[in-house]
């Protein structure tokens, strides 16, 4: 008998978005890092073997081919349903028996001159594993160079076009502990500052324009007590200011002076962080952090100097949220207020942090992988055309930036019903600065939870909800007729003589009882299935 799926996985499949991948690449060796070029359709992948691959793809052709095959598959499904060969038409991407997107079974077999995807170059870049890879973000040379680090304690700079190494530095001489290892890289958007985090919690800074000098530019000792999980630049504040995550704390550092502030102990591992789309290059005030206990927390530098979280969004209690990234799309209000996150159950969630809820779910992995029960999502990126790129240790997927029109219409209807329900509860519920959760039942049962934490951005959303107050009242009016039924129930159970008069009213309310039917589960109620299971899946061997 197979292992029973968690409630969160079942709910995710029911609430699944109709968006499908356009490309899927499978890896025989564990994939440790991947990056998408900021302005071109180029992918970079680093493996546990130390190999680095650079691939390019034709996004337009992949989109067209995927859409064409999907329409063909949908037509065949409708015909089979009409002929009675299948009980229903399957509209789920993950549960479909046929995949209509382009699939590469082995990344090593991608040709050098392929029509849809090709290999630009490949190389054995590091001895041991390649732990992290990033593209250069400097305005005058954006994407022209790549930086990689490995367990060989070497950071290498190479040309994106050719893969040829143009600079490298051995950082082992700058370690306080010779057994220390590199974990993460980060590059300044405006200056040639290349930051590297270590397992002992230090931050080392080098001049990316002159790596061969092997000269350490700055060093921040013990930014954290444990391994650096993430480094995030703060270009709107200063080229010298960065945020770091390690163990259970968030730190604000100045690479020249050291730690500015370090947060309170969150008693939960902090794994990744990002700014919202509208704050990536401006203000850098709001920070969203993913946790090992399946939630996203919201922080504000202007509120408390990033000393503690202000509010939270519960995403998946049975998994760790291993990675998070901004949608990078500020053209649409919903997307601008959203971030993508990936969890250890292979699920992708789009969180609207101002509404405090999960608004879209995709399934990166639904089957057992080579290196675990499922392909845990540990890598997220956004490609040059705002497509989501998700990856685990087995598979990388590029998702379409278009949605199936027929399914989209149905989703819009569901969202309208769902949003009306949210409006009535939010207006009558707790203050905007209380604990934000994707489960409204959680809000109702814990009205005072985190009541001392607040977030100014949520207030605008509440004002919009109040404008639709009348609609929510109209929807809730029929429920008031159930009061007579409650009296009836009380009268039936109570045997005292003074309730005899109520017993005489039985015929009238018994007719109304027919109107009180058990409704079908709404998308909102299905989403609440996610909160009925506990547990954390920790990293192993990464």
Swiss-Prot record:
Acidic residues composition-biased segments: 403-425, 438-461, 497-506
Cell compartment(s), UniProt: Nucleus, Nucleolus
WD repeat placement: 125-170, 177-216, 265-309, 372-409
Bias-annotated ranges (Basic and acidic residues): 462-471, 530-542
Chain intervals for the UniProt region annotation (Disordered): 400-542
Keywords assigned by UniProt, alphabetized: Nucleus, Repeat, WD repeat
Major location (coarse): nucleus
Superkingdom: Eukaryota
Family: Belongs to the WD repeat WDR55 family.
The protein's name: WD repeat-containing protein JIP5
Gene that this polypeptide is encoded by: JIP5
């Amino acid at each position: 008998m197979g292992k029973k799926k968690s409630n969160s996985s079942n709910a995710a499949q029911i609430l699944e978005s109709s968006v499908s991948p356009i490309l899927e690449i499978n890896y025989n060796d564990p994939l440790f890092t991947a990056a998408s070029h900021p302005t071109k359709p180029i992918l970079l992948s680093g493996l546990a073997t130390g190999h680095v691959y650079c691939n390019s793809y034709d996004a337009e052709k992949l989109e067209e081919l995927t859409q064409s095959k999907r329409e063909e598959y949908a037509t065949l499904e409708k015909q089979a349903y009409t002929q009675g060969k299948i009980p229903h038409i399957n509209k789920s991407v993950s549960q479909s028996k046929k995949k209509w997107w382009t699939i590469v079974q082995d990344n090593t077999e991608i040709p050098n001159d392929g029509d849809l995807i090709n290999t630009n170059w490949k190389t054995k870049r590091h001895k041991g594993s390649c732990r992290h890879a990033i593209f250069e973000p400097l305005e005058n040379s954006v994407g022209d160079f790549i930086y990689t680090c490995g367990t060989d304690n070497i950071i290498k700079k190479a040309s994106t076009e050719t893969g040829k190494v143009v600079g490298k530095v051995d950082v082992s001489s700058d370690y306080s502990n010779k057994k220390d290892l590199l974990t993460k890289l980060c590059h300044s958007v405006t200056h040639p500052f290349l930051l590297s985090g270590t397992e002992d919690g230090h931050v080392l800074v080098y001049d990316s324009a002159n790596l061969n000098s092997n000269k350490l530019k700055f060093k921040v000792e013990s930014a954290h007590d444990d391994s650096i999980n993430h480094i995030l630049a703060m270009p709107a504040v200063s080229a010298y200011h960065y945020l770091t995550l390690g163990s259970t704390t968030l730190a604000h550092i100045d690479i020249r002076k050291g730690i500015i502030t370090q947060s309170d102990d969150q008693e939960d591992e902090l794994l990744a962080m990002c700014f919202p789309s509208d704050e990536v290059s401006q203000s850098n005030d709001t920070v969203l952090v993913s946790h090992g206990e399946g939630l996203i927390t919201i922080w504000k530098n202007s509120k408390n100097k990033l000393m503690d979280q202000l509010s939270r969004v519960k995403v998946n209690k049975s998994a760790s949220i291993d990675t998070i990234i901004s949608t990078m799309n500020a053209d649409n209000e919903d997307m601008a207020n959203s971030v993508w996150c990936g969890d250890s159950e292979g699920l992708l969630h789009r969180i609207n942090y101002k509404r405090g809820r999960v608004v879209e779910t995709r399934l990166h992995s639904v089957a057992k992988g080579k290196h675990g029960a499922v392909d845990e999502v540990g890598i997220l990126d956004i490609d040059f055309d705002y497509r989501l790129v998700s990856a685990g240790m087995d598979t990388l997927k590029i998702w379409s930036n278009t949605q199936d029109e027929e399914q989209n219409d149905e989703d819009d209807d569901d969202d309208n019903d769902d949003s009306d329900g949210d409006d009535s509860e939010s207006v009558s519920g707790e203050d905007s600065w209380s604990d934000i959760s994707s489960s409204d039942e959680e809000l109702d049962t814990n009205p005072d939870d985190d009541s001392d934490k607040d977030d100014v951005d949520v207030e605008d959303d509440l004002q919009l909800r109040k404008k639709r107050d009348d609609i929510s009242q109209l929807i809730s009016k029929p429920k008031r007729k159930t009061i007579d039924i409650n009296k009836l129930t009380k009268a039936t159970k109570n045997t005292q003589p003074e309730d005899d008069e109520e017993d005489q009213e039985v015929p009238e309310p018994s007719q109304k009882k027919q109107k009180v039917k058990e409704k079908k589960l709404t998308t909102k109620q299905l989403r609440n299935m996610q909160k009925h299971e506990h547990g954390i899946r920790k990293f192993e061997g990464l």
